[in-house]
Amino acid sequence: NRHMIKHRIMSVATLLGGVIFTGHVVAQSPEVARRLDAKYDVVWPAVDGLIRVNKGGYRIPDSRMKSNGKYGYADTLGQVVVPPAYDDAADFGNGHAVVGRKAGDGRMLYGLIDRSGRVVVPLEWERLGGVRNGVCVARTGTAAKREFSLADTLGNVRSLGYDYCSDFSNGLARVGVGAYVEKENVAGITLRDAYEFCGKFGYIAPDGGIVIPVQFDDARDFAQDGLAPVGIQGKYYVKWGFIDKSGRQVVPCNFYSAEEFLGDRAVVSKVVAGGKLAYGYIDRSGKEVIPCQFDMASGFRFANTWV
């Protein structure tokens, strides 16, 4: 029932019976938790000093499913900061939160608010990423034709002119030039996103300037170690390697797959005799320190791994 759902969500907030700091997540005190629990239907743990609340809705714990209701925010003392007025909302981060409101045609349109509740980016975007490196990636258009812009916390918006743009990760965002192709649906079920992007990828800085030219057939985000897996189309499939933030190829694109480095090792795979995939490990120079020979493998953690 709803009380049980609320209790399970609040259990994180009441852990250790006080205010808890875990990164940017702050759990409110048990007294505040009880007051908020009595006032709202769903209460999330505090993030960036503010607590997301919902009135008139419910959420299934450990899932992304949620009801309509209205979203707002309270502080860690339980005082209302932003009254519940939005149809969708994310947690605060870097002093701002993405909020959404249904338009007359049923579309959810998103914007950005600051800690006082002031709208700094108007609610007119079909997707809006959280603030990273001082900007957020905004998207409008249709599923098959998307337009991307960068919006900063002062409300300035810059059109990018790319067909694809990811959120920023460790200072850079992936951009692409190409087209959206409808996914093949052999099962006859409704796909959450029926289109996928096909084209070439590069990377931009938070000011929108190109850092690594659009040239790769596939690419992933930069990790904290300053490396990103990138792919180049081979004769039969995309081959993967790694680049650094200057675009320098530090590991040649020789592998069927490549995971991000954990420490000084990364899991890679190759196609071997009979078309079988074999997994192994490389160092940061691309040398196979453990040859590709396993049916599966995981990244090194605490000097050990499983294969």
Where are these regions (language model features)?
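Residue-level detector of conserved, function-critical positions
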Residues: 28-307
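Short, Lys/Arg-enriched N-terminal segments with co-localized hydrophobic residues
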Residues: 1-3
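Bacterial N-terminal signal peptides
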Residues: 11-20
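Sec/Tat signal peptide C-region and signal peptidase I cleavage site
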Residues: 24-26
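Bacterial Sec-dependent N-terminal signal peptides
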Residues: 5-7
